Amino acid sequence: MVFQALNGLFDLMQNISEIYNLIKLISKLPGLGPKSAKRIILKLINNRKELMKPLAQTLSEAYKNVTRCKNCGSLKSNNSNCENCQNNSKKYNKICVVENIADQWTIESSSIFKGYFHILGGTLSNLNSQKKEDLLLDSLIERVKKNNIDEVILATSATVEGQTTAFYIQDSLKNINIKVSKLAQGLPVGGEIENLDDGTLISAFKNRKGLNSGSD
C-alpha cells in the first residue's frame, strides 16, 4: 500500500512542469535515474528551508563563481587565485598531467603525488573531433618553462585516446631539458584514472617509467 501511494504521488509530481523539469535534469546526474530523482525532489520539497533553499543558493553561487583556471585547467573561484597554480605558498618541481577534474581529485585523495596538476580538459580524439586546440596543451609548455619544473608525469588513461594524447605531449616536450614519465604499466587496458583504487594508483606512480633522455 505504501509503495502504491508513493507511486501515485510520483505520478502527480510529474504533472507539475517545474517538478517534471527537475526530474529530467537530476536524472542526467551520474548514477541517478528517474526514480532516484523523484525521491530526491520529494526530500527537497519536504525540507524547503533546510535543504531546497540553501541548495538553490549554493548552486547559483557555484554557477556564477566557479570556473576552470585558464592556466592549469583546475577549478577555481572567481573570488580568489587558483590554489593549484597561483598559490605562492606551494613551490613544487613536478607537474602531473591528467585528462579531467575527476582524475585530479582521485590522485589527490590517494596522497601519492605532491606537486602541481595540469588538467587538459579531455583527450585527442577523432571520435569526438577533439583537437589539440581544444585542450590546454600550449599552457602546459608555458608552465614547464616558467616554473622550474623538473618532471612532467603523464597520468592519462590507458585508452587509445589517452595514450595518443600522452605521446603528443611527450613529443611536444622533446626539446625541453626535462624528465617526462608516465604511470607504470599495470593500469587496466581501457581503464580511466578516476576508477582506479588507491593501491593500483600508488603502485603506478611509484613505478612510473621515464620516456626520454632526460629521465633518470
For each feature predicted by the language model, list its residue ranges.
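Conserved phosphate/pyrophosphate-binding and hydrolysis machinery centered on Walker-type P-loop NTPases
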Residues: P30, K49, A62, L75, ...
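Cys/His-rich Zn2+-binding cysteine-cluster or related metal-binding knuckle/ribbon modules and their
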Residues: Q14-I19, K38-C96, N100-Q104
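Extended, structured, electrostatic nucleic-acid-contact surfaces
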Residues: L12-P30
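Signal for well-folded cores of large energy- and translation-related assemblies
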Residues: S27, I45, S60, G73, ...
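Long C-terminal interaction/binding lobes of large macromolecular proteins
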Residues: R48, I141-D216
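Extended interfacial segments that mediate partner engagement and assembly in macromolecular machines
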Residues: A37, N87-T156
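N-terminal amphipathic/basic-hydrophobic helices that include classical n-h-c signal peptides
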Residues: M1-L12
